[in-house]
Amino acid sequence: MANQKGLHVVMMIITVWLLYAAPNIHGWGKEGHEIICKIAQTRLDETAAKAVKELLPESAEGDLSSLCLWADRVKFRYHWSSPLHYINTPDACSYQYNRDCKDESGEKGRCVAGAIYNYTTQLLSYKTAASSQSQYNLTEALLFVSHFMGDIHQPLHVSYASDKGGNTIEVHWYTRKANLHHIWDSNIIETAEADLYNSALEGMVDALKKNITTEWADQVKRWETCTKKTACPDIYASEGIQAACDWAYKGVTEGDTLEDEYFYSRLPIVYQRLAQGGVRLAATLNRIFG
């Protein structure tokens, strides 16, 4: 117990340093990742909830969502982790692990799907891990999984290499300059939060949780289903590239101004991907720790 308490103190110091020493650049954006982790934490069974609380540093005060951005911020110290946030595909609306899961040097497995496989497998050792070092790695593994499960559900994190996931497609979001990737990372969610929820993130979280038990209730079992003990990121990535083609890229050309028509037609897709990310993160942790 003393060793574990000491570990939590070390983790708190390291985590705080990493969080505040790095620039504020995010995946889904702060709100999107928080939403996914908030949804997930409410769906954890008792065993998984206990494991998550034990692995989180004391600074998190038991709140997984407070550290769901850790993986974004730490990549400026862990440079090797940058390619683990996305998948580059050909301009063909399809994803294949063996073809697409690699970094720019061609090293296989270095993409968000490969990272999810890796870190969920590490978490399987939680029950038998004894040393402080392995516990520290499992804390990082939990934070990586929680973040990457969000990234893989953002459609433009599984998208075309030719435009860097929409990052090179310059448009306007209403009156503001933006690129298409940033619109899906942040602008759609921020606009919804401001216009539909009085800038209250909890209102959006509550609405999504309600939809999970009502509007999407008949789909949740399918979202949770995975034949592996850990996660099924290839399914999530295949859905992602399809959503990118059908919704993110569709009808958009360089220099366009995207306004209400794009916002209201794409918002349901954003809502669904956030909900799927939260449901699947919880299901993954329940399988691993159960």
Swiss-Prot record:
GO MF term (any one): double-stranded DNA endonuclease activity
Biotechnology: Can be applied to high-throughput detection of single base mutation.
Activity sensitivity to pH: Optimum pH is 7-8 with ssDNA as substrate. Optimum pH is 6 with RNA as substrate. Optimum pH is 5.5 with dsDNA as substrate.
Propeptide stretches in the record: 283-290
Signal peptide: 1-27
Pfam families linked to this entry: S1-P1_nuclease (PF02265)
Processing and modification events after translation: N-glycosylation is required for enzymatic stability and activity.
Record-level GO BP terms: DNA catabolic process
Disulfide bonds: C37-C68, C93-C245, C101-C111, C226-C232
Catalytic activity from the UniProt record: Endonucleolytic cleavage to 5'-phosphomononucleotide and 5'-phosphooligonucleotide end-products
Thermal dependence of function as given in the entry: Optimum temperature is 70 degrees Celsius. Low activity at temperatures below 30 degrees Celsius. Above 70 degrees Celsius, the catalytic activity declines.
Residues that, per the record, bind substrate: 28-33, 72-76, 85-88, 94-99, 118, 136
Region described as Substrate binding: spans on this chain: 147-196
Role, per record: Endonuclease mostly active on RNA and ssDNA, and to a lower extent, on dsDNA. Can cleave mismatch regions in heteroduplex DNA containing single base pair mismatches or insertion/deletion bases. In contradiction with PubMed:22506810, cannot hydrolyze single-stranded DNA and does not cleave mismatches.
The protein, known as: Endonuclease 2
Organism of origin: Arabidopsis thaliana (Mouse-ear cress)
